[in-house]
Amino acid sequence: MNGRNNDMGRNGGADYDDRDFGRTPDLNADAPGRRRTGRKRVCRYCADKALVIDYKDPQALKYFISERGKVVPRRISGNCARHQRKVTLSIKRARNIALLPFTVTA
């Protein structure tokens, strides 16, 4: 015997060294089931300072509303946190004065 317990325990009888269990995963390897998202989007309002977020412009705000009438999240729209808050506030104001619908009818 080599000093180890000889029963068929957790490792099914395989003879592993202790260092095999404490190994850190390879951080450069792609995780299975995850997709690469490509390039990070740049906030259009930070890139072009001439663009303004206005609640009275429903055509510009429709880009940030989904088909069901929900506000599109930052990770999809590409806005920075500051401009996403302003877009959300503008959408809510436009809904209150009936420039944008609260829900989309089928």
Swiss-Prot record:
Q: Which Pfam families match?
A: Ribosomal_S18 (PF01084)
Annotated region described as Disordered, given as residue ranges: 1-39
Instruction: Give the molecular function GO annotations.
Output: small ribosomal subunit rRNA binding; structural constituent of ribosome
Q: Which InterPro entries would you find in this protein's record?
A: Ribosomal_bS18, Ribosomal_bS18_CS, Ribosomal_bS18_sf
- Database matches in PROSITE patterns: RIBOSOMAL_S18 (PS00057)
Q: Which UniProt keywords apply?
A: Ribonucleoprotein, Ribosomal protein, RNA-binding, rRNA-binding
Q: Which GO terms describe its cellular component?
A: cytosolic small ribosomal subunit
Can you supply a Gene Ontology BP term from the record?
translation
**Task performed by this protein:** Binds as a heterodimer with protein bS6 to the central domain of the 16S rRNA, where it helps stabilize the platform of the 30S subunit.
> Partners and quaternary state?
Part of the 30S ribosomal subunit. Forms a tight heterodimer with protein bS6.
Family membership: Belongs to the bacterial ribosomal protein bS18 family.
What is the protein's name according to its record? Small ribosomal subunit protein bS18
Q: Which organism is it from?
A: Sorangium cellulosum (strain So ce56) (Polyangium cellulosum (strain So ce56))
